[in-house]
Amino acid sequence: MSSRILTPDVIGIDALLHDHNAVLAKSASGAVAVFANNAPAFYAVTPARLAELLALEEKLSRPGSDVTLDAQLYEDSQAAPVAVPLGKFAMYADWQPDANFQRQAALWGVALREPVTAEELASFVAYWQAEGKIFHHIQWQQKLARSVQISRASNGGMPKRDVNNVSEPDDHIPPGFRG
């Protein structure tokens, strides 16, 4: 096992127990690495060195600047709903489908069990912003419905899982199996 010694002064535990005042007085830095069984066990420090270390820790724990950032920079404010443009338009970053999008998608033959997730919508908008095509609002919604249907088909009809979520075990025991 490798270890890092933070002082050039090293001594065995037996020598420290024999005369700790003399050992600490000889150390140039006010700290001695104490070894037991050829491995570092702990550090012995003089009261003066301990006071220096505590003062340094106190200094480092204070903020380094008097400048504070405004709290509103950290808050995600809800954007005001953007009115849907009339006629054909190119995709824009704040575009949203209608509130009854799932029902409309069902009328178009696309049954979505779950609402469109923010990730699915962001992916759709980013793709079509880059394309630069123009369509009516209803056509954009139809494209979104088809896009979500195709992406979910590869995942059993469900939205893609967040890779950061920890899965939970299934506690359900099917009929006919003992638990």
Curated annotation (Swiss-Prot):
GO terms for cellular component: primosome complex. Keywords: DNA replication, DNA-binding, Primosome. One of its GO terms (biological process) is DNA replication, synthesis of primer. The keyword DNA-binding applies. Homooligomerizes. Interacts with PriB. Component of the replication restart primosome. Primosome assembly occurs via a 'hand-off' mechanism. PriA binds to replication forks, subsequently PriB then DnaT bind; DnaT then displaces ssDNA to generate the helicase loading substrate. Residues 155-179 are annotated as: Disordered. Residues 159-173 have a biased composition (Basic and acidic residues). The keyword Kinase does not apply. HAMAP family: DnaT. The gene is dnaT. It comes from Citrobacter koseri (strain ATCC BAA-895 / CDC 4225-83 / SGSC4696). NCBIfam families: PRK02854.1. It comes from the Bacteria. This is Replication restart protein DnaT. Belongs to the DnaT family. Involved in the restart of stalled replication forks, which reloads the replicative helicase on sites other than the origin of replication. Can function in multiple replication restart pathways. Displaces ssDNA from a PriB-ssDNA complex. Probably forms a spiral filament on ssDNA. InterPro entries: DnaT (IPR020917), DnaT_DNA_bind (IPR040480).
